[in-house]
From Swiss-Prot:
An MF annotation (GO) of this entry: rRNA binding
TM ranges: none
The protein's name: Small ribosomal subunit protein uS14
Source species, domain of life: Bacteria
Family designation: Belongs to the universal ribosomal protein uS14 family.
Gene that encodes it: rpsN
Function: Binds 16S rRNA, required for the assembly of 30S particles and may also be responsible for determining the conformation of the 16S rRNA at the A site.
Amino acid sequence: MAKQSMKAREVKRIKLAKKFYSRREHLKSIISDLSVLEQDRWKAVLKLQTFPRDSSPIRQRNRCSQTGRPHAFLRKFGLSRIKVREAAMRGEIPGLKKSSW
């Protein structure tokens, strides 16, 4: 189990990313638009740097919904490999069975 503080940190990152999404996208479009004056683009870069680090969606980490484990996360199920295996062995995931050949 992940610490509660780590889970809370991820929730905070998600909330910040949603809050700053439109502002970040607007500034990033100004930065990448070559028809805008260089001085204005530079101001947009400086403004973007004033935003909190955690407002960037890149800093979010996928975590297991049951345990909070950050590694071996399977997107399809929203669980770590360990919890997927446990659920599959109990037959809780429809259509998933242990392979045999």
